[in-house]
Amino acid sequence: MTGQDDLEYAIYLLTFVQELYCKAYKCLHQMEELRKFINDIYPMNDVDWNFFSSKLEKETFKKNTALVKIGRVENYLSFISKGVIRLYIPQEENELTFGFLFENQFVTAYDSFITRTASDYEIETLTDTTLWRISFDQLQEVYNKTESGNLIGRRMAENMFLIKSKREVSLLNKTAEERYLDLFSERPRLLKEIPLKYIASYIGVTPQALSRIRRRIT
């Protein structure tokens, strides 16, 4: 090899190592975010965390990718490292959107996941999305082999139930404008990435009515 070849090869190696370092650092940061989220539910010791994290798989999905389809069994509990996700029921005329999930939240078709039966709704990505996922069988292993696994699982189930209850109470007690403001106050930046037709469906109005609401409050 010539001196020029040596230099080019050295630059290539340096670039490759830098890319590996950046990817490793990014993964480490994402895992730290997940551990913080879980510790807020219930503190997990290092031994349990290492066992749990060894079961996680990182997956990336393009925008508008179906994660769960009607009639299919949900096999994963996923933590959203990056992205926006929609839960909805397909209908002949209009889809019924009943949930949005964002970064640092869990997503799963939970009823299908725990009962091992077909899902009655669908889940899709609204943006390019990164998930940390654990399968049903691997989660059962975590429950069986760690001290804190079962308690964390119960707390996560309670958290999902509270989110569902909050949504139902909102539909019964709040106006469409109040529901929109609630969603806007939660994630104002990410809300811009959700098509208005899905937001309209979520708060229970037509797209035209949503446009009027947006004009009134801006």
Features from the language model and the residues they span:
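Cyclic-nucleotide recognition modules
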Residues: 96-155
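Short beta-strand segments in beta-sandwich/barrel cores
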Residues: 57, 84-88, 106, 130-131
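Phosphate-/nucleic-acid-contacting segments
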Residues: 15-18, 174-218
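Glycine- and acidic-residue-biased ligand/ion/polar-headgroup-sensing regions
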Residues: 75, 79-85
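Cyclic nucleotide-binding regulatory module and flanking cytosolic helices
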Residues: 16-57
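Basic, amphipathic alpha-helical hairpins
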Residues: 144-146, 164, 186-191
